[in-house]
Swiss-Prot record:
<dbReference type="Pfam" id="PF03464">
    <property type="entry name" value="eRF1_2"/>
</dbReference>
<dbReference type="InterPro" id="IPR005141">
    <property type="entry name" value="eRF1_2"/>
</dbReference>
<dbReference type="GO" id="GO:0005737">
    <property type="term" value="C:cytoplasm"/>
</dbReference>
<dbReference type="InterPro" id="IPR029064">
    <property type="entry name" value="Ribosomal_eL30-like_sf"/>
</dbReference>
<comment type="subunit">
    <text>Heterodimer of two subunits, one of which binds GTP.</text>
</comment>
<protein>
    <recommendedName>
        <fullName>Peptide chain release factor subunit 1</fullName>
    </recommendedName>
</protein>
<dbReference type="InterPro" id="IPR005140">
    <property type="entry name" value="eRF1_1_Pelota"/>
</dbReference>
<dbReference type="InterPro" id="IPR020918">
    <property type="entry name" value="Peptide_chain-rel_aRF1"/>
</dbReference>
<dbReference type="GO" id="GO:0016149">
    <property type="term" value="F:translation release factor activity, codon specific"/>
</dbReference>
<keyword id="KW-0963">Cytoplasm</keyword>
<dbReference type="InterPro" id="IPR024049">
    <property type="entry name" value="eRF1_1_sf"/>
</dbReference>
<dbReference type="InterPro" id="IPR004403">
    <property type="entry name" value="Peptide_chain-rel_eRF1/aRF1"/>
</dbReference>
<comment type="function">
    <text>Directs the termination of nascent peptide synthesis (translation) in response to the termination codons UAA, UAG and UGA.</text>
</comment>
<dbReference type="Pfam" id="PF03463">
    <property type="entry name" value="eRF1_1"/>
</dbReference>
<dbReference type="InterPro" id="IPR005142">
    <property type="entry name" value="eRF1_3"/>
</dbReference>
<dbReference type="InterPro" id="IPR042226">
    <property type="entry name" value="eFR1_2_sf"/>
</dbReference>
<comment type="similarity">
    <text>Belongs to the eukaryotic release factor 1 family.</text>
</comment>
């Protein structure tokens, strides 16, 4: 096989990389037998082979026979695969090789990532070192969400179709009492000072969690939400970092809850800010699918053969596909070819497990009824 053809086969997409990282993170070993190798573009493979041969030659110093054999096997597999190439691909090369010592299962993953590798790195460890790949699968359309009350706050993030709680905070602010006169005013000042301190704490946590994303260009906006006037006090006060203020949504959002439930409510209500976000699209598409299913309208299709036939006819308006499906990329391409919108159903969606078990994680909403349905 030619170098160009092999490079094409080795190159993986961001979705494929995200799926692979999820698998790699499951691997662990009782000893340092899992090999991780990062080769940046332009690095001569001959240099890498020399390093691996040197590492192989010193494995005899490993005292435990099982560990020694596992490391040798990983190094041999890496060298065998590198010999298939004459040069490093344009985005570099990554190898993860190792044995699951509890089952004896051995795997060696070699691929060229969707973005260039920046470092040359080799290590055998108790886990695969995936740190240098994490940024490549980070969604570039993130929205920060801050739900704030005078004594509670939640900081969350919407990344693509994933909604997650980053931090939950609690403060202590006493309630009202029946004092009068100066005592009342002094008590109120103390309460306001406590609220001020809590807001400062929320602002600091928001800076720690969200500013790095804003500086990388990942964070596209910040929503401030809450049940009362506290959110307005928080925004009007000098509590938010200027880098977050620049991308602050102009409208505050009323929500009744904290935590993940509050974040979901904020996302659904802040339509103008997150209308392009996949999470809201996934929620709406799933609701439409369930409505057609309940009413028996004949405007949905499921089952791989029927979905494929409907796509070929151009009858699918929206293709819903669960993010865990191994053939996700293939269906995305088929949908694009037929002009269908693709909704990737995230595992965080309430109906995700039901959708996967009942429909195999694949279904379509139709533009018009077809006879195969």
């Amino acid at each position: 096989m030619s170098q160009g053809r092999l490079e094409e086969r080795l190159t993986i997409s961001k979705r494929e990389l995200a799926r692979l990282l999820k698998e790699l993170k499951k691997w662990s070993a009782p000893a340092t037998v899992l090999l991780s190798l990062y080769i940046p573009p332009g690095r001569p493979l001959s240099d890498v082979m020399t390093l691996l041969r040197q590492e192989y030659s010193i494995t005899d110093n490993i005292k435990l026979k099982r560990t020694r054999q596992a490391v040798k096997r990983a190094l041999s597999a890496a060298m065998d695969r590198l010999q298939m190439l004459t040069s490093t691909p344009p985005n570099g090369l990554v190898l993860f090789c190792g044995e699951d010592m509890s089952t004896g299962k051995f795997e060696c993953f070699m691929f060229s990532p969707p973005e260039p590798i920046r470092v040359f790195y080799y290590r055998t460890d108790k886990r695969f070192i995936t740190d240098f790949l994490e940024d490549m699968v980070e969604d570039n359309n993130a929205i920060g969400i801050i739900i704030v009350e005078r004594d509670q706050a939640t900081i969350g993030l919407l990344k693509g179709a994933r909604l997650e709680v980053l931090k939950e905070l609690e403060g202590f602010v006493p309630g009202k009492h029946k004092m009068g006169g100066q005592s009342q005013r002094r008590y109120e000042r103390i309460i306001e000072q406590m609220v001020d301190e809590f807001f400062k704490k929320v602002g600091e946590e928001a800076s720690n969690l969200l500013v790095p994303l804003a500086e990388k260009g990942v964070l596209k906006g910040v929503i401030v939400a809450g049940p009362g006037l506290a959110k307005q006090e928080f925004v009007e006060g000098n509590y938010l970092d200027y880098r977050l203020k620049k991308i602050l949504a102009p409208e505050l959002v009323d929500v009744a809850y904290q935590g993940l439930q509050g974040l979901k409510e904020a996302v659904m209500k802040a339509e103008k800010v997150v209308e392009a976000q996949m999470y809201r699209d996934a929620v709406n598409a799933m609701e439409e699918f369930k409505l057609h299913l309940a009413k028996g309208t004949g405007m949905i299709v499921y089952g791989e053969k029927d979905v494929e036939a409907a796509l070929e006819m151009g009858a699918v308006k929206t293709l819903l596909i669960h993010e865990s499906r191994e053939d996700l990329e293939e269906w995305v391409e088929k949908a694009k070819s037929s002009g269908a919108q693709v909704i990737v159903v995230p595992e965080s969606l309430a109906e995700a497990e039901w959708f996967l078990k009942t429909f195999g994680g694949l279904a379509g909403i139709l533009r018009f009824r077809i006879s195969t349905v």
